[in-house]
């Protein structure tokens, strides 16, 4: 619409008004005729031609001013519209799908027994408490956990954590925003987005797990994503199932190892306690026997 209006005004000025203006100026540049009759006719026609020329000039100037005003107005409106579109497009931009899928995913029942703190943990997006059979996605940079479906929709248009507004996007040169642990070698690479220390920031949106379990979740997620990108000789569905089942088995092994370690520690503590109790009892008995023997050795009072 703006381009059409500018073109129309330009055509009117160049093809209609400008020729009329030049035509009315022609009598003033012609040579003067020597006959008196022609001079009298020019004197009688001078006022009319002058008025017409002034009117045409005024119309030309007015249209030029209107064209300049419309050009500035429409140009400013176009610039503002373009800036608003860029702003909204940046605001709607979320995280890449590959980055979202790199965040660990698991069932709540698999880690429920190992979480730190009392009380339930709930999703900050739908405000529903987690149940055993629900699939969760864990944000390693801030340890906040959400339903996988809820956080996937959120991160499609946002790049921050819904609970703490931490920036989850990658910086240039980074591959993952959290530590990567190799299951075979046990090597760990830490960057500035390190995991939160245990016992800190315990709230209803934070799923705090032991540090070893955190590393296991990250590593198992890497195995699952690598198995999902197998060659096309295998179907994508089979690759996903094999990767997910393998990750589940390894996660169960890690949980069982953690539980067995806890049970062993508890049994050791109980054994040590029983040994201390037996030792104290035997020492008390020995002390009583010594006192009795000492009393027997003492001479009787006369």
UniProtKB/Swiss-Prot annotation:
Keywords: Membrane, Metal-binding, Phosphoprotein, Signal, Transferase, Transmembrane, Transmembrane helix, Ubl conjugation pathway, Zinc, Zinc-finger. Pathway: Protein modification; protein ubiquitination. InterPro entries: RING-H2_zinc_finger, Znf_RING, Znf_RING/FYVE/PHD. SMART domains: RING. It catalyses: S-ubiquitinyl-[E2 ubiquitin-conjugating enzyme]-L-cysteine + [acceptor protein]-L-lysine = [E2 ubiquitin-conjugating enzyme]-L-cysteine + N(6)-ubiquitinyl-[acceptor protein]-L-lysine. One of its GO terms (biological process) is protein ubiquitination. It is a single-pass membrane protein. Its EC number is 2.3.2.27. Its main location: membrane. It is an enzyme of class 2 (transferase). The chain crosses the membrane at residues 50-70. It comes from the Eukaryota. The modification Phosphoserine is found at residue 226. A zinc finger (RING-type) spans 123-165. The RING-type zinc finger domain mediates binding to an E2 ubiquitin-conjugating enzyme. Belongs to the RING-type zinc finger family. ATL subfamily. PANTHER family: RING FINGER DOMAIN-CONTAINING, RING-H2 FINGER PROTEIN ATL35-RELATED. This is Putative RING-H2 finger protein ATL35. The lineage of its organism: Eukaryota, Viridiplantae, Streptophyta, Embryophyta, Tracheophyta.
